[in-house]
Amino acid sequence: MSLTPNHRPVLVVDYGAQYAQLIARRVREAGIYSEVIPHTATPQEIQEKNPVALVLSGGPSSVYAEDAPGIDPDILKLGLPVFGICYGFQAMTHALGGKVAATGKREYGRTDLEVKGGVLHDGLELSHKVWMSHGDAVSEAPEGFTVTASSEAAPVAAFENVEAKMAGVQYHPEVLHSPHGQQVLTRFLTEIAGLEQNWTAANIAEELVEKIREQVGPEGRAICGLSGGVDSAVAAALVQRAIGDRLTCVFVDHGLLRAGEREQVEKDFVAATGAKLVTVDERKAFLDKLAGVTEPEAKRKAIGAEFIRSFERAVAGVLEDSPEGSTVDFLVQGTLYPDVVESGGGAGTANIKSHHNVGGLPDDVEFELVEPLRLLFKDEVRAVGRELGLPEVIVARQPFPGPGLGIRIIGEVTEERLETLRHADLIARTELTAAGLDGIIWQCPVVLLADVRSVGVQGDGRTYGHPIVLRPVSSEDAMTADWTRLPYEVLERISTRITNEVADVNRVVLDVTSKPPGTIEWE
């Protein structure tokens, strides 16, 4: 199941931009529901979604390239408000009869925008910074459009036709590097397109509960695996709100957990929801399946497959205590929108890696999936959790991958290596919390390079220990991320404690890679 809201969407047409999903998120931040569709969508397919407006995303192509994705002119004749961004701005111009030129001047990064009036930039400084990323530029606006901004390399950096409810900008209003970008996007949606801002956490929760009731039916029973994270907790809380005690939550202790995690789930979630919880100990089964497995994708698949097998065993146990003839047909998953995107869930997207909530399920899975969060971003999930009354200890928890520490050990997963990583992870989390840094870090994976040995000096002799990698990142939604600039004294305390207290570790290193190009998790 995925959320099909009672809201007509703003459709973000994806031209291959890394920020297409971020645009959709910004539209929702403006209080309006949005979805992403591929640029290959036909006018008929667009009409079937009954949208209220279109936003054309950026993309890497030139409108003059032989295989450049364009926009069907018939789409622009549907009578919908249209907003073009970067490449979408140029494609829109081209389709409407304006001119796009290869000026030979490129603009990448922060750029001065010169405002010449109009609705989009009304009240903003006449010269302010925006984030540009383009080679070609619009040299002449289509007939009926007013040029409202320019830059050094883009004579037409923004235009609008208020009567036709169409506008566009050459820069990227969706990124934080364009300080007034959210205001500009909201102006288009509300003042030019005339849309109502009615997308809130309260109505998201209400609609989700109703959709779950429709899918599961009046007698259907569901099972939900709790990981201890916010996604599974909110998904379970929604389903329980919808079907009550026909939901059984199962916490699989697969041995890949962080220190104290099992106890936290058994205490915090049950106290907050009163849900039925069954805990099963499957540590040996998972370690047996992972024995000798070192390839990251193989590990993910093995963990996903064994998780379902563990679930089936748990279901059998639940059914033993149920009325004769009862079955459990529905499996609740906390899949999020970025999960689907990263797993190649849309046309034109590359399959980066098999996501732990999407691609690891075996073909013979016996459950019908209930995925109430599938079209939500992380901030929306937290908002729904608060709306449902879940405590901050759950909704504010940093993300943790479904495969757990299994994908934070580079190499074979063994009990000894898990204990090493678990100890190092606890030290890092304890020090970050003590320093008051939890609020600025999206998450901080701690990674054990188990197949690497580095030379060190500890005590009176040389050692050959494993390196530990700290990967603190800051992000809004996990689609893009930057490494967090932690205070040196905090890094020093973490490093000193890990090398002093964790056996067989003699080096701590800091990962300073952004996403892209690197993903947040190492595997």
UniProtKB/Swiss-Prot annotation:
Entry keyword Methyltransferase: no
GO CC annotation terms, alphabetical: cytosol
Summary of subunit composition and partner proteins: Homodimer.
Active-site residues, as the UniProt record annotates them: 86 (nucleophile), 172, 174
One Pfam family recorded for the sequence: GATase
CDD domains reported in the protein's UniProt record: GATase1_GMP_Synthase (cd01742), GMP_synthase_C (cd01997)
Keyword line: ATP-binding, Glutamine amidotransferase, GMP biosynthesis, Ligase, Nucleotide-binding, Purine biosynthesis
The Glutamine amidotransferase type-1 domain, residue ranges: 9-198
EC number: 6.3.5.2
Protein name: GMP synthase [glutamine-hydrolyzing]
